[in-house]
Curated annotation (Swiss-Prot):
<dbReference type="GO" id="GO:0003676">
    <property type="term" value="F:nucleic acid binding"/>
</dbReference>
<dbReference type="GO" id="GO:0005737">
    <property type="term" value="C:cytoplasm"/>
</dbReference>
<dbReference type="GO" id="GO:0009318">
    <property type="term" value="C:exodeoxyribonuclease VII complex"/>
</dbReference>
<comment type="similarity">
    <text>Belongs to the XseA family.</text>
</comment>
<dbReference type="Pfam" id="PF13742">
    <property type="entry name" value="tRNA_anti_2"/>
</dbReference>
<dbReference type="InterPro" id="IPR003753">
    <property type="entry name" value="Exonuc_VII_L"/>
</dbReference>
<dbReference type="InterPro" id="IPR025824">
    <property type="entry name" value="OB-fold_nuc-bd_dom"/>
</dbReference>
<protein>
    <recommendedName>
        <fullName>Exodeoxyribonuclease 7 large subunit</fullName>
        <ecNumber>3.1.11.6</ecNumber>
    </recommendedName>
</protein>
<dbReference type="GO" id="GO:0008855">
    <property type="term" value="F:exodeoxyribonuclease VII activity"/>
</dbReference>
<keyword id="KW-0378">Hydrolase</keyword>
<keyword id="KW-0540">Nuclease</keyword>
<keyword id="KW-0963">Cytoplasm</keyword>
<comment type="function">
    <text>Bidirectionally degrades single-stranded DNA into large acid-insoluble oligonucleotides, which are then degraded further into small acid-soluble oligonucleotides.</text>
</comment>
<dbReference type="InterPro" id="IPR020579">
    <property type="entry name" value="Exonuc_VII_lsu_C"/>
</dbReference>
<dbReference type="GO" id="GO:0006308">
    <property type="term" value="P:DNA catabolic process"/>
</dbReference>
<keyword id="KW-0269">Exonuclease</keyword>
<comment type="subunit">
    <text>Heterooligomer composed of large and small subunits.</text>
</comment>
Length: 457
């Protein structure tokens, strides 16, 4: 009989550590799908939330260095798909998962892809309204790209038949759902452009979920619509369904039936318009004829008034009056000219310039004589004043003083030597004489004593 073995005894810490290691090493990394609840983000930047389904829930943590790579903001109730490691928080014994990556699940993922493609194409300018092509008015041939068995085609054909039965319609059948649908739609658009049979295209399908309409959110379809030379009207789903094709197309219709109305003419309305135009044209013609008749009568009357014989007679009378006025004007001008000529001759005789010229010449000679005397007198006076000034200037000139035996001595800085304190033994001085300069060196200095004045008693 084998001796009984005592059971292993764990401490709480060791138990939690053992469980954590088992979870982390045995299970490893897993993918989990669930719904987010209790989402929080404290100041640390980490995300804490609960991932649940109908029957269970688990606590989750996603640290900041991982969650900053997530391209969307998680919302309460959102279905997500996460890649995570299973672990145990040892201090409390709480089982939790550490999320490494997160992406929307199901339609959430499709919506994320939709927003990313929309932002990309918008940045490239494919949504620019200035690039939209105008629809022909009226359309002479309509091309329809949709499923040949779908309700959308039935609605389009029904509306076109009701509004404009004579309008040609060319159908380019294609799948509108499934993996092959985007490629078929692209080929149908390219085929319509290659054949160039239509002047407008309707591209669309009936309503459905986001996944059902996903072919019209495909980048290939969007670029094919943008590259189409033929204007494209998008007619995808219902009015609330908005796809990438709606943004790219030259015009968006809320439904396939609305698209058919946009590209077609209402024959009943056209008939009413034609009848209205005919009525207005008849009234305009009646008014035009009546107006022309009145003008013709007026012109006939004016023509009678403007008969050539009458016009010639009036012109002749006017010419005779003008000739008479011209003759009178010429005679009057000749008489005025003769009278003026006589007056000018009389004034000329009265204003003989010879005596006046003699008087002016005599006055000029007298003025010239007086001017010569005045100039001579002024010159004599100025010469006398100049001689006196020269004599006075020579009398006070330093050169005259030097000529009498005096001299002027300057020290090295060029100042005149006035006192013995300006020099010292060894200084060189310059003495100015009448006929030159003498440089000398100071050998000694002797101050002269001034005689002091006695104060009165």
């Amino acid at each position: 009989m084998l001796p009984s073995q005592s059971p292993a005894i764990f401490t709480v810490s060791r138990l939690n550590q053992t469980v954590r290691l088992l979870l982390e090493h045995e299970i490893g990394q897993v993918w989990i799908s669930g719904e987010i609840s209790n989402f929080t983000q404290p100041a640390s930047g980490h995300w804490y939330f609960t991932l649940k389904d109908d029957n269970a829930q688990v606590r989750c943590a996603m640290f900041r260095n991982s969650n900053r790579r997530v391209t969307f903001r998680p919302q309460h109730g959102q279905q997500v798909l996460v890649r995570a490691n299973i672990t145990l928080y040892e201090p409390r014994g709480d089982y939790q998962i550490i999320v490494e990556s997160m992406q929307p699940a199901g339609e959430g993922l499709l919506q994320q892809k939709y927003e990313q493609l929309k932002a990309k194409l918008q940045a490239e300018g494919l949504f620019d309204q200035q690039l939209k092509k105008p629809l022909p008015s009226p359309a002479h041939c309509v091309g329809v790209i949709t499923s040949k068995t779908g309700a959308a085609l039935h609605d389009i054909l029904h509306v076109l038949k009701r509004r404009d039965p004579s309008l040609p319609v060319i159908i380019y059948p294609t799948a509108v759902q499934g993996d092959d649908a985007p490629g078929q739609i692209v080929r149908a658009i390219e085929l319509a452009n290659k054949r160039n049979e239509c002047d407008v295209l309707i591209v669309g399908r009936g309503g459905g979920s986001l996944e059902d309409l996903w072919s019209f959110n495909d980048e290939r379809v969007a670029r094919a619509i943008f590259a189409s030379r033929i204007p494209v009207v998008s007619a995808v789903g219902h009015e609330t369904d908005v796809t990438i094709a709606d943004f790219i197309a030259d015009l968006r219709a809320p439904t396939p039936s609305a698209a058919a109305e946009m590209v077609s003419r209402n024959q009943q309305e056209l008939l009413r318009q034609i009848q209205s135009v005919q009525q207005r044209l008849g009234m305009a013609m009646d008014y035009f004829l009546a107006n022309r008749t009145r003008r013709l009568t007026l012109l006939h009357h004016r023509l009678q008034q403007q008969h050539p014989q009458l016009r010639l007679a009036r012109q002749q009378t006017a010419l005779e009056r003008l000739q008479q006025r011209m003759n009178l004007a010429i005679d009057s001008q000749i008489k005025r000219t003769n009278k003026r000529q006589v007056r000018l001759l009389q004034r000329l005789n009265q204003q003989n310039p010879q005596p006046r010229i003699h008087r002016v010449q005599s006055r000029i000679q007298h003025l010239e004589h007086r001017l010569a005397e005045h100039v001579h007198s002024r010159l004599s006076a100025m010469r006398e004043r100049f001689g006196n000034a020269v004599t006075h200037l020579e009398a006070v000139s330093p050169l005259s003083t030097l000529a009498r035996g005096y001299s002027v001595t300057t020290v090295t800085d060029g100042k005149v030597l006035k006192k013995v304190k300006q020099v010292k033994t060894g200084d060189v001085m310059t003495t100015r004489l009448e006929d030159g300069w003498v440089k000398s060196e100071v050998k000694g200095i002797t101050s002269a004593k001034r005689a002091q004045k006695k104060k009165p008693d």
